[in-house]
Structures are given as structure tokens and as C-alpha cells.
């Protein structure tokens, strides 16, 4: 049914791909539920949505919504470093067993009679045959190095993001500054 509608629009557009794409997007927004029709010019404060059941416009303001992408306003470099260190150590502690399994599966990958079918099978066989602590072997060294590395990275990222945001768009959050900051390794 969806294919028939697309083909019908293609023949009606007679070679104008912009019309086909525009009609397809409009139909997608209408069938998927409320879609974004307009915004207030990029300030991020107000968005207008149209309900599919009626033609009324609902206005939503996000001025009072909490921002989860940043630490509180008065945060200093120490808070950013602590947050980065904790996040980095936790990430390595959670992902280290998976990385251990990935390394083993990659070393056995070309063999059709490989010992492991999937990640969970590999992890259970490693724990059963070599002991519970085997997938965590070497984690202490990795976590010790991850703390300072992630602390420095996170603090540099936040400082550079704040500096670029103040230069490009004073008093607010600038997505261009965040993009530039993400492209520059610390």
C-alpha cells in the first residue's frame, strides 16, 4: 500500500524529485502522529505541533524544562573533572568484559568451527571454564588509567564548549560551538 502511494506520487510529479520527496515527507508526518510544522526561528523556546485528529495548533514551550546535558551553572573545573573520571571508570568497568569477549571472538572469527556462537555464549563459556574473574582480568590497570584520562578530556571539553559558546553566541548554548568542540580532540 505504501509502495503504491509512492509510485503514484512519482508518476504525478513527472520527473521532479523535490515534489515527490516533499509529498512523501508531508504524508509521513501526517501518518506518524504529531509532526513539527514550524518553530520560532531557532531560539529553541517554542515549537508548534499539529495534531492529526484536528487542525488545531498546540504550542509547547520548553523554558521550564530542566537541562540534562550540563552540570549546574556554578560548576567549576573540579566538578567537571570528577564527573568525567567517574563516567570514564564506570564505562570501562561495564564494557571491559564485552571487550574481552570481542577480542576472543575476533581471534577465532575465520574458523567455521569457532567455539562461541554469540557474545552471551562466549561470556558464559569463559566464566564456566576459566572462572568468574577471567573476563575482568586487567580491568584494574585500565580503570586506573581511564580515570585521569576521562577527567582531563571532560574538563577540556566543557571549558572549550563554554568558551566557544560565549564567542559565537554569548549568553546561550550554541550548537555550532558544540560541533567544533566535538571535532577537536582534547
Swiss-Prot record:
GO biological process: iron import into the mitochondrion
Reactions accelerated catalytically: Fe(2+)(in) = Fe(2+)(out)
Solcar repeats: 75-163
GO cellular component: mitochondrial inner membrane
Molecular function terms, GO-annotated: ferrous iron transmembrane transporter activity
TM spans (from-to): 77-96, 137-157, 172-185
Entries under Gene3D superfamilies matching the protein: Mitochondrial carrier domain
Originating organism: Xenopus laevis
Family: Belongs to the mitochondrial carrier (TC 2.A.29) family.
Subcellular location(s) of the protein: Mitochondrion inner membrane
Keywords associated with the record: Ion transport, Iron, Iron transport, Membrane, Mitochondrion, Mitochondrion inner membrane, Transmembrane, Transmembrane helix, Transport
Function per UniProt: Mitochondrial iron transporter that mediates iron uptake. Probably required for heme synthesis of hemoproteins and Fe-S cluster assembly in non-erythroid cells.
Bilayer topology term: Multi-pass membrane protein
InterPro entries, per the entry: Mitochondrial_sb/sol_carrier, Mt_carrier_dom_sf
Name of the protein in its database record: Mitoferrin-2B
